[in-house]
Amino acid sequence: MEESAPFSIVSTVKALSGALRGDAGHEADISREREKLWFKESSAKNLRNRDFLAPNTVLTTLYAGGEVPSDILSAVHTLRGSGVLPIGATEVTTEGLRVCVDRCAAFRGVLCGIMPYLKPAAQRQGCVLINCPALHTKQSVPSPDTLALGQLRTILIADHLGAQLRRQGYTVSFCPALPQESDIVNFLKTLGIDWPTVPVSWTNEDREEKMKKALENSAYRDRETEKGKRRSRGEEIEGEKRGLKEDVRINLKQVVQDENLNGYDPSLGTCTVQREALCHLAQLDSATADFPASTTTALHVTSCQDEFRQQQTAMLWRAAGATALQRLVICGPVKTPGVQMNAAQYFQLRKAQMKEASEMKYGDQVEGQTWDDIIRVMTSATVRFELLSTVHTSPVTLDVQRDSGVSTKGPRGGVFVMYNCARLHTLFSSYEKGVEQGLYPEIPGGTELDFSALKEEGEWLLLFNYLIPFSEILDQSAQTLEHEGGGARVQLRTEQVCRFLVSLSKDFSSYYNRVHVLGEPLPHLFNQMFCRLLLLRALRELYHSALDSLNLPPIPQL
């Protein structure tokens, strides 16, 4: 039923905008511009006296002298609708029209039905191929020692995108498939990446032959250029090595023009087909073999240095007959000032620093398989947050000095996030022990609790800034794919989940350091304790859901 739709910031802002303009009954017609009538507050300071604000500049634009008519004020105050937060109070102040949510009702609505807030707001259909050029065979299979940090960044972004899009309902495949038990596959496993593999003896020769014939017979083959270029004997031998008895040249510029594609490099001209390109095209063809062309999108996740080459490959695939929508996710470089470092060295450095930090805190306890697993996950978390927390088109600069170390206390990065997630595990372990000992009763159903007991400003901040908007954040990659223009590049905000988790961890840590959740086992204190436990249980599930999109399992201690 529409009334049971989870609360949504977007739905609330749209409804408020409609009410302020006097067209609340026509929410579907409200443009994105109208959403700017209202601002959702997020700082603790502003949330003390309002949750949404329509500034005076907006009011004076809409109404003479900024005087809001009484019927409009009434419409805002009595606002209802699918996904709309319950309105508690409205007031015209010197800053504008402020709106306060009925917080008790909001806590009850969210905490008594948390599951919709932990998954994307909508489920979609379609197929997405995520292609990672850094992993394609050139002379030999890539290895951790030959993998540059910029290439590692593209792999982590590809992995994160795949996890997000699968949760949004898409069927996702990855390209290329890698040889089983190869060094690169084992390295990716240490980072929590389950990349598709094939037997070592597997070949893709049939599909390479298919791609070769498709290009030889392509309408975009530039035979005039081929005729004008005689090959030496050495070039003929090299061509035979490439599987091509004669040069095959494709007019990529014509492909771009005929397909009316935007955003491609204007210097794309005529390209000679290399064996490496045939292998790449064969992998793309194999990965999309079971996908219907009409609903398939290919995302090429590549570094800025390799963008031109990948544009060439994309247009060769198109010239060979592929009809999938192709977009490029371009990633900025990774810089390590004063140091040359490959992916394997970087991972080993962070692992050594993580082990050292753990030994300083826990001493001789840090040994055995359990601790090996914890250190591996924490290292993976550190690497992922360092390489994913920046907008993917921007450069990342890493501090890779051996003595810089890592800390669980500093409010940044994967270690801090995992530490605060582990604190929630410890809290609920302590509560469950208290239940076993008879100190506390089981948490009753949310409908039996009085959520007006949640008066701490940090409690509302955690609900309003994190629990309610989370599903909308998970939904944004698919929204961008669906609605952004059809240029070659697409920007998918792959940094959002990491930044969201770091911000959440700062606010949760501040709250948890101030508030004693498990109080004295006195009946008159139980209602507030149970309300807080429900809030923090929802936060724990949020952590797990967000970390799952990064392929990071939560850990019980740190």
Curated annotation (Swiss-Prot):
Pfam families given in the database record: DALR_1
GO biological-process terms attached to the record: arginyl-tRNA aminoacylation; tRNA C3-cytosine methylation
Entry-linked InterPro entries: DALR_anticod-bd (IPR008909), DALRD3 (IPR037380), tRNAsynth_Ia_anticodon-bd (IPR009080)
Region described as Disordered: 213-240
GO molecular function, one term: tRNA binding
Name the UniProt record assigns to this protein: DALR anticodon-binding domain-containing protein 3
Species this chain originates from: Danio rerio (Zebrafish)
Lineage, highest ranks first: Eukaryota, Metazoa, Chordata, Craniata, Vertebrata
Gene: dalrd3
